Amino acid sequence: MKALDLFCGAGGAAMGLHRAGFEVHGVDLAPQPHYPFTFHRGDAMEWLLDGYDFIWASPPCQAYSASTLALRRAGKEYVDLLAPVRTRLRACGTPYVIENVVGAPMRGHTVLCGTMFGLRLLRHRLFETSFPICSLLPPCQHKGDEIPVYGHGTPSWHRGRYDRNYSVGEKCVAMGGSIG
C-alpha cells in the first residue's frame, strides 16, 4: 500500500507510516536531503493525489502555533493552508489524516502526545481524520523527564522549565528515532 506524506519535512510522520507497512512518498517545497523514503520536491497543494491508498498532511502550523503568537499579534501574517488542504483531501476520497498544532481549527480532532505511546516526547498535536479512530487512547504520561520538540528549538517561554535547548539527537531519540 502507498501513502502520500504532504508537507513532509524531514519525515517524522513518514517513519510512522513506514512502520505501519506503507510505501511512503513525501512531498515538500523545500529540499529534504535526509527524508528516509521516496522524496518529491513539489507543491503539496498541486501534487496529484491519485494512486495512493492513504494521505497524511501536515500543513504549515505557524498561523496557529503558540510559538508565533507574539509575532502574529504584532501583525505578522503566516500562510494558512489548513482549510484548502481539508477541501482537497475531502474531494479526492482517499482516507486521510491532517496533523497540526493545538490551536488550529481542526474538525472532530483527537489530541495525541508522544508520552501516550511510551516516548519521552512532550508534543501535543491535533489529528483530524476522514475515518473514525478509537477513543480508548491512554492518557498523557507527563512525568517531568519529557523533551519538548518544536519547529526550530525550544521557545524562550518554555526554556525556564527545561533549562536548555535539547540537541537534534536528543529530540530524535525522544521521538522514537524519527525526525520531523
What do these predicted regions represent?
Residues 3-48, 56:
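SAM cofactor-binding core of SAM-dependent methyltransferases
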Residues 6, 28, 41-54, 61-180:
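Class I S-adenosyl-L-methionine
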